[in-house]
């Protein structure tokens, strides 16, 4: 995927070294990156210049759609992505609101499905969007946001990819996703799969055609212990053609996504890739 490699090269060539207090590492950083995914023509943005794993990314976002707040529920879907943040983040372990093992608090999907109002009632942002789009309504506010400044301290992690805005032009559905921070060698592969799949699913359950998905990243970075692998290995490889994503056509409603859908309902067709690269992960 050439636009991904172009961003990596831009960071290598133009990035500024920034100290990251949370991880104790330096990051080579650029501000503002824009990526576009062709969902209409099913050009699935799975990185081909190293072996990439897509199921955990879709499983995680399915957990957000369901409003999960417990790492055990994510494991049942097929992803362990929340194990460390729920159980090994010392600040969260010391937080008195934490309910115990695997509790994530009010993060991501909790905000998307149960945003709290001052009177104690909750707002289901996703349901409102699905209802409107199914009726052909775009009120220019079809926005799903996971970023709630008033409840940051009630969860184990601030959202990185935090807001998703849907737009209708005729019967074609578009998505613009916003991300405050991105570990490009590791996280971006995960996030671009989620952006693509979210639009594909929402188009399918609302009866619309999928258009383009736009992904805006504010702070795009490569950690210092990832730098040489990116510069000397991954950027030396030629990408293969992008694969396709097949989604079970029996998925027709939000209730389907909430109840019976599993990773068996997704298939990637025609994926070719280079050998795996083991990038260090920063917690």
Swiss-Prot record:
It is found in: Cytoplasm. Disulfide bonds: none annotated. Its EC number is 2.1.1.45. Keywords: Cytoplasm, Methyltransferase, Nucleotide biosynthesis, Transferase. It is an enzyme of class 2 (transferase). DUMP binds at residues 22, 180-183, 191, 221-223. Pathway: Pyrimidine metabolism; dTTP biosynthesis. Homodimer. This is Thymidylate synthase.
